[in-house]
Amino acid sequence: MQWIILGLTVIAAGWGGSFLRMRFLRKGRVSLLASEKHGARIRPRKDGPDSLLLFGSLTLTSSSGEDITSLLTGRLKETLLLILFHTRSGGISSRRLSGLIWPDKEEEKSKNVRGVTLNNLRKILNRMEGVKLVFEEGKYVVRFGEPAYCDYVESLSILDDYSPGNDRLLSILARGKFLKDDGDLLFDKMKAEIDDKVASAVLAEAQWRFSNADWANTVLCADILLRIDPLSENAIKFAVKALSAMGQEDEARVRYNNFINQYKKDYDEEYASSFDDLLHH
């Protein structure tokens, strides 16, 4: 068993983040290795009291554990997210906030509706411990303290100083794409910036998981990448290789076929690489 593990580690390390020619050990041995060396796929972070989760479906949970997401009307959600996104750079001014959410209203009218909106938002956040909407130095910010939690805030902290092998990041990202149910054009740029940061980190994570023969979480990384870019060639290569290493070649072929069908639909041409090309190169 030791020589199998050593052999895989040496081969994977030589891969160095690019897809070089590589053949896996026969299916029976690889399946045994994967089951003995690694545990299950990392699970998504669960909702908990005093939490605001933005990856996957936006979820707001009170101190009592009640899901209070439905209290956020469209305007309240926009206000919360705009303030939250700007908090990292020092907050957002009243004028800027009004200009983004109520661009057609005169200053006096927008001031009144802004005041009502912010008061209603504070009432909702007051049902959570450790979350405060405050106005400081002329700008609105959202502050999180114990025991409150926000996956967006934690993800930025991790991504700022990222190194592969981070289970916490994968647990956050496993919930789903950032603001996956939100089609508000107001947040398109912000979502794109988060997607870019996530994709860069998860590609490095996938390479690290693969080089350490962590097949299940290599597949998880591939799934995360494909949510961001359904035609990510790196992602489908990782998925095909890792699933085959786990003895799940049928599933690998299903995913490959789905990929090439989507590729054909989007580009009106056949995908150049065969299943075997991805598996062995």
Question: For each of these PLM feature ranges, what is it?
Answer:
Residues G90-L100, K105-E106, G130, V134, ...:
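Short beta-strand->alpha-helix linker/helix-N-cap micro-motif
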Residues M1-I5:
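Juxtamembrane/start-of-transmembrane alpha-helix segments at the extracytoplasmic/lumenal side
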Residues V113:
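A conserved beta-strand->loop->alpha-helix hinge within the catalytic CA
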Residues L6-G74, K132, G138-K139:
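Short boundary/linker motifs that mark transitions into or out of structured domains
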Residues K46-L52, V116-P147, Y263-S274:
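DNA-binding patch around the recognition helix
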Residues D67-I101, L121:
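Short amphipathic alpha-helical recognition elements used for nucleic-acid or partner binding
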Residues L71, F85, E106-K109, V141-H281:
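Intrinsically disordered, charged and Pro/Gly-enriched terminal/linker segments
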